[in-house]
Structure formats: C-alpha cells, structure tokens
Amino acid sequence: MDYSQFLYMKEELSLIAVILILFVVDLLTCPDQKGATPKVNVRSLTLPAVILMTLHTVINLFPGTPAEAFGGMYQYTPMQTIIKAVLNVGTIIVLLMAHEWLKREDTRIKQGEFYVLTLSTLLGMYFMISAGHFLMFFIGLEMASIPMAALVAFDKYRHHSAEAGAKYILTALFSSALLLFGLSMIYGTSGTLYFNDLPGHITGNMLQIMAFVFFFAGMGFKISLVPFHLWTADVYEGAPTAVTSYLSVISKGSAAFVLMTILMKVFAPMVAQWQEVLFWVTIASITIANLFAIRQQNLKRFMAFSAISQAGYIMLGVIGGSEMGMTALVYYVLVYLAANLGVFAVISIVEQRSNKVEIDDYNGLYKTNPKLAFIMTLALFSLAGIPPFAGFFSKFFIFMAAFNSGFHLLVFIALINTVVSLYYYLLIVKAMYINPNEEPIPTFRSDNYTKVSLVLCTLGIIALGIASCIYQGIDKFSFGMGM
C-alpha cells in the first residue's frame, strides 16, 4: 500500500486526532458520577475544544491540487477544503454556544461526550463530502447520523428530547433504507458505484429513474426538503438548542453540498429528469415552509420551518448544476451559518436563563436585553435577505445562478416567497421592539463563551455583507485550481 495516499486525508486524520485528544482529556478531567475528584483540574472542556478546532481549521486551510486516493474511493478538491472549513467555523460557534447549557448540573459530567459526539458527526460529514464511491458516501452518512441521534436525545431526562431522539432515529433509518434501495438499483444497472465511472453507465432507463427517486428521497430527509420534512419541527423543538442549531446548519449544509456533487457527477446524463424533480421540490419547500412558519408560536418550531424554507433557497444553487451554482451554494451556506447560529445563540441563552422559548415571551426584549435584541434583529434581517446584510447578497448570487441556468419562473416564485418571509421574520422584530410585556425576560449577562459566539455571528453577518468579494474568492479558490 502507498501510505502517501493518507496525506490526502489530512483533514480527516487531523479531526480524528482532535477527537482522541478531547476523549483523553475528558477521561482525566471529568469527575465520575460519585463525585470523585478528577485527576486533572480543568474547569471546562470548551476552551480546549475550541482551540483544537481552530488549529485544525487553520492548518488544513491551505489547498492542494485535485487528487484521488485508495483507488478512487476518496477524492480531494479545493472546493471540499472550503466547505469543510465552513463547517468547522460553524462547529466552533456551536461549541461556544453550548457552554452555558453544559454547565448545568445534569449535563456537566457529560461535556466530553457532547464534544466527542459533535466532532464524530463532523468526521462523518468529512468522509461524505470527500467520497468518490457510494460505499464511502454511505459510511460517512451513517457516521454522521448515528452520533447526531445521540446528540438529539442528549437531555435524556427531558421527555421532549428523548421523543425527538426517537423520531430522529426512525427518520434516519427510513431515509437510509431508501438510499440503500436506490444505490442497489444503481449498482444493478451499472455494475459499479464509483462516481467517475457511473456517468458512462447512466442511460436514464426506468430502473435508473427509480434509483434516482429513492436516492433523492433519502437525501431529501437529510436536508428537510418538502415532502420529506415532517420530522423537522418536532425534532428541532425537542432537541437541546445547541444541537438544533448544529442540525439546522452544519448537517444541512454538508448534505446539500454532497447532493449537488453527486447530481453533477453521477446523474449528469439525467440532468433533465432531476432538474424537473428539483424544480417542484424547491417551490414546495419554500412556499409550504413559509405558510407554516407564519402560524408558529414556539420559536424553535418557527426556526424549523425557516430552515426548510432556506433549504429550498439552497436548492436554487443545486438545480443549475453549474460552477456558479456550486460557488453560490457554498457562499449561501456560509452566510446562513452566521445568521442562523446568531438566532439560535440568542434562543439558547434566553432559554437557559428564563426557560422561555415562545415568540410572545420575546415581547419587550429590547427594553431588558437590548444587545441580544439587536443581534437577533441583524440575524433575522440577514435570513430575510434585507440589504445591506449578508443574506441579501447570498440570495442575490444564488438567484443569479438559477436565473443564468434558465430557471426564470423558479426565481420569480422564490422572489415572491422572499417577500412573504419578510412578514414572519419581522413579526419577531416587532415583538422585541414594539409589543408590550407585563412579565418580560429579565435582564441578565451572558457568559464569555456565549458572548464570543454572538460576536462571531454578528461580525460574520456584517463582514460578509460588506465584503461580498468573498464570493469571488471562493470561486477563484475552488475553480481556479480545479474543482
């Protein structure tokens, strides 16, 4: 075996090293359930986890040339480096956000488990993104899904968390079964599962169309596209808020990137068929999610339908199947990451301090916690696509990608839905600044880790809006060197 091939997997190997280090540190620092004194006194694993993840991100940010390893099972491209870096940044923010929750007495001794499970999920996404073979893709998918199920049910003594975990596991099992059924059809008609070999065997016959339908349905569950979205609101509401934020951004972003990669590589000969399917799924996702979001009272359920709608917008980048669409997708995920995690950071700290998650509970938040209200407003404006915030530019680029690919009607419908989404995002802004509240959320100070996560999200929203040249940078970095 040529061991130099492992150098192409430096990102995965580096992340495995981070996981092992945190695992060992947790063994040395965490008191057992009987309250015994730990061997090494470390107040929190958050700081070591954040430092290690930051080093991991910086070290692996330097690009290489496109390459394959292990007979084509593993593929490396500069674009993959970017999407992995984006996922790393989101994961770091989630780790910072989770610190306040993990300080609770019932979760304090499980800090190490949370970090190891979170990074194990990220590792699975890495393998999924770099897969050059459907077997590698499926292994990565399951490596991401199984720890995620444990994270969703992490608050096992809360009924809602356990229920959400059960629903997520059942949904993951069902979607994996659909995927495997589709992959078996692909193998049966082509005799191979290598991404580079499959286009020569894809003819668009009826069995391959059925294979695509099952594959797309399985991925639709992962991305929360309509009509595969029914689990989303219940799981988002029941899971711990930090886990919900991770599920809504990191998991969705990686799955969308992988879906586009496979559609462009494997199913390129069936482009007319999958574009038609994606056309209607995109319209349904954006429209139905908007209608349901208007009716929500629980803020986490509200963000669930917002996430479904945003998944529809992300599909605008996928449907064109172009380099411009790929760049727009990555940029959109980056902006969505900053805005969505900003909202969830506010929800998380408010929930920890007041146990309130209803939209009406946020009435008058500006009077008691003006900084939190300001950050929430910036994030919601960005999600709505209001200029000059980053969300406006991300929507502009992804709309242009679809428009240049000839999907003019789809872009028009998406624009109408964007106007509709302004209404329900501004409802929360109205609640915070205008609506009176006899029992408002009390004034409180956030812990330092939460402050850092809020600052990072705020800077991301503002900087990505001002420096829209980042979009060109992503494109040059990725396609200037080869995808």
Curated annotation (Swiss-Prot):
Q: Could you tell me which Pfam families the record lists for this protein?
A: Proton_antipo_M
Q: How does it sit in the membrane?
A: Multi-pass membrane protein
Task: Give the EC number.
Answer: 7.1.1.-
GO-annotated biological processes: ATP synthesis coupled electron transport
Q: What compartments host this protein?
A: Cell inner membrane
Transmembrane segment boundaries = 11-31, 45-65, 82-102, 112-132, 134-154, 168-188, 209-229, 253-273, 274-294, 302-322, 330-350, 373-393, 396-416, 454-474
Q: Which InterPro entries match?
A: NADH-Q_OxRdtase_suN/2, ND/Mrp_TM
Name the reaction it catalyses.
a quinone + NADH + 5 H(+)(in) = a quinol + NAD(+) + 4 H(+)(out)
Example of a GO cellular component annotation carried by this entry = plasma membrane
- Its main subcellular localisation, reduced to a broad class, is membrane
Molecular function as annotated in GO: NADH dehydrogenase (ubiquinone) activity; NADH:ubiquinone reductase (non-electrogenic) activity; quinone binding
Q: Oligomeric state and partners? A: NDH-1 is composed of 14 different subunits. Subunits NuoA, H, J, K, L, M, N constitute the membrane sector of the complex.
Protein name per its UniProtKB record: NADH-quinone oxidoreductase subunit N
Q: Which gene encodes it?
A: nuoN
